[in-house]
């Protein structure tokens, strides 16, 4: 394999790597966006309606009925409420700590891990563009140094490759940066909504488990 063949191979591989980074970054953004939507209620009104239904069951001491309301609901508040109900015998303080830890581990850590991949794509895309720029300029100057007469078309192809890879890298990174900003806003709103919902639930839950604790 001569240098021209090697250059062509690496050039095509650079395009392939850029396409892969763009696809993976976009895929992770879509996953995070859907994950946040899956874990939160549409608005505070919908969440309060669910919590009111839950409070009616808890106020009657109907823990099984309350658990059935949460069952099958993949949102964070119902899942954490069900966890609290199933572990009510360990005491209110431990239950509160348990659901806080589980929210951080099961929801926030998962989102942070996926978001890390998006940040990696944002950093990698321009670097691949810079790599393509270096390859293109090396090829162009290599032809200038070794040929008596240089074909302007060949030089234009090398310089074009350098500029195209740079443009692709920036075009990949910039929308992902905007998407990350939007995702961070959605995550922050989800945290605020879940925190408000859990505070509401814990007040009702504490009152419901108090008579049980006194009996023991």
Predicted regions and their residues:
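Lipid-exposed faces of alpha-helical membrane segments in multi-pass integral membrane proteins
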Residues: 17-30, 118-121, 128-131, 168, ...
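Predominantly long cytosolic amphipathic alpha-helical stalk/bundle segments
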Residues: 41-131, 135-150, 179-216
